[in-house]
């Protein structure tokens, strides 16, 4: 008699987004990506680039809008999310931003954030084009 072992896994690693921890500028919008299977070291590397771009605006006395793309963000460990929060919620960086748009995966977390958000200058989206339309229309 033969036995077969069936292993059921959740998710499919082959569908994980490729690592992207870049930050770019388009006019007065800073676009930062934190996508893929993210480790704590990736957060630190991402923040170094992100902070440099923000500091350029700050040193010139310019305000900016942020597009934070975390669509496809998968933390490698629970400590990754804490590291991201500790780095991103930086008083200097946030005080110089006029608007922040978060691009996230569609689902319960996005729905919760959209429904519970009370700040006019912060919005949550699952569509890149809608995110850009809102940011471009937001006054600086």
Enumerate the predicted regions with their spans.
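Amphipathic, Lys/Arg-enriched alpha-helical "gate/interface" segment within cytosolic domains
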Residues: 2-140
């Amino acid at each position: 008699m033969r036995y077969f072992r069936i292993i059921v896994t959740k998710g499919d690693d082959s569908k994980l987004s490729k690592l992207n921890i870049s930050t770019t500028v388009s006019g007065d919008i800073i676009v930062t990506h934190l996508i893929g299977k993210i480790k704590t070291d990736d957060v630190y590397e991402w923040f170094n680039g992100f902070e440099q771009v923000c500091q350029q605006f700050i040193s010139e006395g310019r305000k900016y809008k942020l597009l934070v793309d975390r669509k496809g963000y998968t933390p490698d460990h629970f400590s990754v999310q804490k590291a991201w929060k500790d780095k991103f919620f930086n008083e200097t960086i946030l005080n110089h931003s006029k608007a922040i748009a978060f691009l996230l995966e569609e689902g319960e977390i996005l729905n919760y954030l959209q429904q519970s958000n009370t700040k006019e200058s912060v919005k949550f989206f699952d569509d890149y084009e809608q995110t850009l339309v809102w940011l471009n229309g937001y006054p600086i």
